[in-house]
Design a protein with these regions (language model features):
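C-terminal catalytic "cap/lid" subdomain
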Residues: 8-251
Length: 251
């Protein structure tokens, strides 16, 4: 008798989230030790993780930060006009977006970059219906350029795009394995939340995302999952519905 072994992890029928918005910190792309703004090894790892869930049939939208290149808020403290600084930051996210597209396509994942500011020789402008069409055709879509406006973070851009594309969840990939009561690097007694409500996250002003991003997800009923991107197959486990990191929702 032949035995059929089913790998539950790779079974498309077990997906909990069919369309996700993945928020990746720009700082995670950089390497402070080597001074590289974009570390090829880290970029390749990220692309490989995205490929795994794309192969499962998950429709993937990605928003990248730009902190590895330039952060508008930091620049404002060093004499750069805030609006100009944020514009520089938005351009940084486009650089990261093009790098991610290149890394994904190098491993066979069809990808498009859509920007919030017109830069048509490099990428498509963001048009909601066109983005949905890309998903239908099996493409990963990288949303770059933030919201296209100063004073809005890339976390808020991620919440906005997640709302516009009707994402089942916003997955925020960080260097830590969830949201804590305090900074675990500074406070040894800090405890990780398994789950919490949007209102609590807003009330406690938890710094993992800004209040505008939390509020936008709350208003549109989009759950947020904060997890450690470098924890092996964490991304796969999240889309399968396993309890990974911290879940922020209305429950």
């Amino acid at each position: 008798r032949n035995c059929i072994i089913v790998d539950v992890k790779m079974n498309k029928d077990n997906l909990k989230y069919n369309r996700i918005l993945l928020k990746l910190s720009g700082e995670v792309l950089g390497n402070r030790e080597t001074g590289e703004c974009i570390d090829p090894t880290r970029l390749a790892f990220m692309a490989g993780q995205v490929k795994k869930i794309h192969a499962l049939g998950v429709q993937v939208g990605i928003v990248l930060g730009g902190g590895n290149i330039f952060r508008g808020l930091t620049g404002a403290g060093k004499g750069v006009n805030r609006v100009t600084g944020d514009s520089m930051g938005m351009l940084a996210t486009i650089i990261n977006g093009l790098a991610m597209m290149n890394a994904l396509e190098a491993i066979g994942v069809p990808t498009r970059v859509m920007t919030a500011i017109d830069i048509d020789k490099l990428a498509e402008p963001f048009i909601q219906r066109k983005a949905l069409r890309h998903f239908e055709k099996g493409r990963v879509v990288v949303f770059a350029g933030g919201t296209g406006n100063p004073y809005f973070s890339t976390d808020t851009a991620a919440a906005l795009r997640a709302s516009e594309i009707g994402a089942d969840a916003l997955l925020k990939a960080t260097k830590v394995d969830g949201i804590y009561t305090a900074d675990p690097k500074k406070d040894p007694n800090a405890q990780r939340y398994g789950s919490l409500k949007y209102e609590v996250a807003l009330e406690k002003r938890l710094k993992v995302m800004d209040s505008a991003a939390f509020a936008l997800c709350m208003d549109n009923g989009i759950p947020i999952i904060v997890f450690d991107f470098f924890d092996g197959d964490a991304l796969e486990r999240v889309v399968m519905g396993e309890e990974v990191g911290t879940l922020v929702s209305d429950k």
